[in-house]
Each structure stands twice: as structure tokens, then as C-alpha cells.
């Protein structure tokens, strides 16, 4: 199990002798003398779990590891693998977010037929993502066609900058700037347009939300959603039936595109959502649901009812290589200032009856964190 610590536990030991050490012998820098394209090809074949260490070798390595060229090379070689990150957020400081990546011990998983609290440790952990990786995760990414948009400043200060990376030609360019500076904004794509909301001052009523049209390369401000939404804590944004839904800690809202107006959403949006193989899943009312597009209704994921009795708090869900990954927290004791973050991996299968069945592969405590920090959301992609 990993531990969330904000202080380094590395201590230097004093030298036992005053004898000066001989100067280190210069080592041949054969690897660093290679052309960048050769280095990128080599790095693309290495597991991303080593990137954090390699980024400390030199500034050149760090820039290459964080570059879009490396991402393109991994896509070309087919070495990208699914990954999922979970965010822990301070309730008193909304922008104090700590990112952790799920590290899974490589071995063959067998679905659990029965399990109790005293499950054998699986060796899976949530590992902290140090700077600059955690900052990169907080930069908003959204894909429209073959283009990936980056919204927000690299140094995590509010910014109007928008960068576009075209996977087809492998080049990056700067897009027209937003109308207001943002950081940690929420985005979604609907009908080929990019919607951006929040991430700015709550009193920014004119441009709290705006939409970008890639065809005309223009930004347009959306109507003011009102004080109640602007001053609430936005949880996520999702699209459904040609509408944009915003879930907050107070109420749920919907933006009606054709009418150009905001309304309070009466329907249940789910507390956490993700998409797996073109099927939308959500966690709501202590249950896991999937959306049947043909019947236009939410249906229960079957086979995972035992998981419902295992925790009392809300959970966050994500997509890990086609499997449903679930995170929740569990208090160890009322007397302690820490709590456990638990994780479950669920494989999914559609039965002959048209229902989706889940099979719990494993679950375990993967992190010990300060009790004051709350699970915010998951982010999943190929890395």
C-alpha cells in the first residue's frame, strides 16, 4: 500500500570521515549524444513507469519525455498502455489537488467468486505523480476529430492559451485564445464544437462559459448560467441528447443549445461517469449503471451487488483498458487523521439477455491519505 506524504523521507547521512573524496571520473555520454529521433524511439519502447526517474537525468530528457513527439512515437509503435489517475482534493483549498497513478502488479488476475474484508494484499498501489507530471494532468485535454486541444497554462496559472495537436500530421499549433483566462476548467465536445466552462473567477458572468467552433476558428460566449452555478463547485460536465449537463455540489444544470438558455436539470446525472467501448457508465445512488442507447434508459450493472455493502461513501469510476475501475475511501478509525483509499477492478461482459455483467477481478487498499482530502475525479487515457 502506498502512503500519501507531503514531506520527503529522504535523509542524508553525514560522512564518517573528513577525508575529501576524489573527484568523479567523467563518464561517456554516448546516449545523450544520439540524435533526438533515435532517443525518442528508444524512450517510446520503455515502460512509462521509468519516465519519472529518467526525467531527472537531464533537461533534454525531461523535455523529450514531456513532448508530443514521444506520444506520437508511442502511438506509431503501438506501445501505449491504458492508465488511470485519481485526484485527491483539499476541501478548503479547491486548487490543492494531488494526483496519483494506479500501478498494477503484473500477474494473471482471476475473478473473485467470494471475498471478505481480509483479502490478501494484491501489491497494487496508487503512486504520487510529482511535478511536472501532476501539473500536466491538470491541463485540460479535449479531442475533436483528429485534433487534441490543451486548455490552460503550462505553469498552472490562469491562461487564455489554447494549443492544438493534430495526430494526423504530428504537429502542434496555437489556436485562437479564449475570451477569459482559465485554469482547471471543465470541457466537453458536442456536435463538433468545444465547450469550456468554469476555471475562472465566480463573478465572471459574461464569459463563465464559452464555445469554440473549429470550422470558423472562433469563440462565442454562452449566456450567464446564474450566480448559483458560478459560485458552486462543479463536479463534471457531460453531454446527452444534444444538451450539455453540468453537475455541481448544489444542483444539476443543463444548457439548452437550441434555446441558448440554462435550466435546472431534474434528471439524475450520476455522481461519477466514464465511457467504456462506446457505453456510458455512471455511479449513482450507491449503484453502478450503464446507459442503454437503444432503450434510452439507465440499467444496473449486474454481478457486483456484493461491492455495494463494502463501503458507505461515494466512489469515483474510470476506464482501465476496457475494464471498470472503482475508487472509494474508507475510514480506518475515528481517532486517526488518515483514511484508506480502496480500488476495485471489474471486467465487463454483455450477456445473451442483453444485460451487462461485472466480474470483480480484485480489490484492495491502495493508498493511505489524510482524512481531510476527498476523492475528486478520475482521468483515464492511453499513455
Curated annotation (Swiss-Prot):
Residues in Kelch repeats: 147-192, 193-239, 272-318
Keywords: Kelch repeat, Repeat
Keyword Repeat: yes
InterPro entries assigned: F-box-like_dom_sf, F-box/kelch-repeat_ARATH, F-box_dom, Kelch-typ_b-propeller, Kelch_1
Pfam families (alphabetical): F-box, Kelch_FKB95
Classification via Gene3D superfamilies: Kelch-type beta propeller
Region of interest called Disordered, as start-end residue ranges on this chain: 1-27
Domain of life: Eukaryota
GO biological process: response to cold; seed germination
Domain F-box: start-end pairs: 28-79
Role description: Involved in seed germination.
Name this protein carries in UniProt: F-box/kelch-repeat protein At4g19330
Species this chain originates from: Arabidopsis thaliana (Mouse-ear cress)
Gene that this polypeptide is encoded by: CTG10
Amino acid at each position: 500500500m502506498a502512503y500519501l506524504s507531503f514531506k520527503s523521507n529522504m535523509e542524508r547521512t553525514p560522512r564518517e570521515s573528513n577525508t575529501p573524496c576524489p573527484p568523479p571520473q567523467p563518464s561517456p555520454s554516448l546516449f545523450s549524444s544520439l540524435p533526438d529521433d533515435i532517443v525518442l524511439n528508444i524512450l517510446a519502447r520503455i515502460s512509462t513507469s521509468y519516465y519519472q526517474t529518467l526525467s531527472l537525468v537531464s533537461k533534454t530528457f525531461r523535455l523529450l519525455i514531456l513532448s508530443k513527439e514521444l506520444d506520437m512515437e508511442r502511438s506509431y509503435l503501438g506501445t501505449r498502455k491504458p492508465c488511470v489517475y485519481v485526484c485527491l482534493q483539499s476541501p478548503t483549498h479547491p486548487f490543492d489537488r494531488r494526483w496519483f497513478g494506479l500501478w498494477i502488479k503484473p500477474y494473471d488476475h482471476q475473478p473473485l467468486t467470494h471475498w471478505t474484508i481480509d483479502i490478501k494484499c494484491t501489491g497494487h498501489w496508487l503512486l504520487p505523480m510529482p511535478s511536472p507530471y501532476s501539473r500536466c494532468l491538470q491541463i485540460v485535454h479535449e479531442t475533436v476529430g483528429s485534433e487534441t486541444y490543451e486548455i490552460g497554462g503550462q505553469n498552472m496559472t490562469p491562461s487564455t492559451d489554447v494549443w492544438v495537436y493534430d495526430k494526423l500530421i504530428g504537429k502542434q499549433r496555437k489556436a485562437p485564445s479564449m475570451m477569459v483566462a482559465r485554469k482547471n476548467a471543465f470541457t466537453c465536445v458536442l456536435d463538433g464544437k468545444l465547450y469550456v466552462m468554469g476555471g475562472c473567477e465566480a463573478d465572471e458572468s459574461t464569459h463563465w462559459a464559452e464555445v469554440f467552433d473549429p470550422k470558423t476558428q472562433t469563440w462565442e460566449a454562452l449566456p450567464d448560467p446564474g450566480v448559483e452555478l458560478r459560485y458552486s463547485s462543479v463536479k463534471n460536465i457531460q453531454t446527452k441528447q444534444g444538451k450539455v449537463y453540468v453537475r455541481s455540489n448544489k444542483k444539476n444544470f443543463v444548457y439548452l443549445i437550441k434555446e441558448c438558455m440554462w435550466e435546472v436539470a431534474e434528471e439524475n446525472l450520476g455522481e461519477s461517469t466514464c465511457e467504456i467501448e462506446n457505453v456510458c457508465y455512471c455511479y449513482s445512488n450507491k449503484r453502478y449503471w450503464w446507459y442503454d442507447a437503444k432503450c434510452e434508459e439507465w440499467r444496473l450493472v449486474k454481478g457486483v451487488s456484493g461491492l455495494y455493502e463494502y463501503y458507505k461513501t461515494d466512489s469515483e469510476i474510470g476506464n482501465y483498458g476496457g475494464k471498470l475501475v472503482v475508487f472509494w475511501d474508507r475510514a480506518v478509525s475515528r481517532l486517526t487523521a488518515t483514511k484508506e483509499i480502496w480500488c476495485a477492478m471489474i471486467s465487463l461482459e454483455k450477456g445473451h439477455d442483453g444485460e451487462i455483467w461485472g466480474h470483480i477481478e480484485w480489490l484492495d487498499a491502495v493508498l493511505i491519505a489524510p482524512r481531510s482530502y476527498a476523492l475528486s475525479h478520475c482521468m483515464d487515457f492511453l499513455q
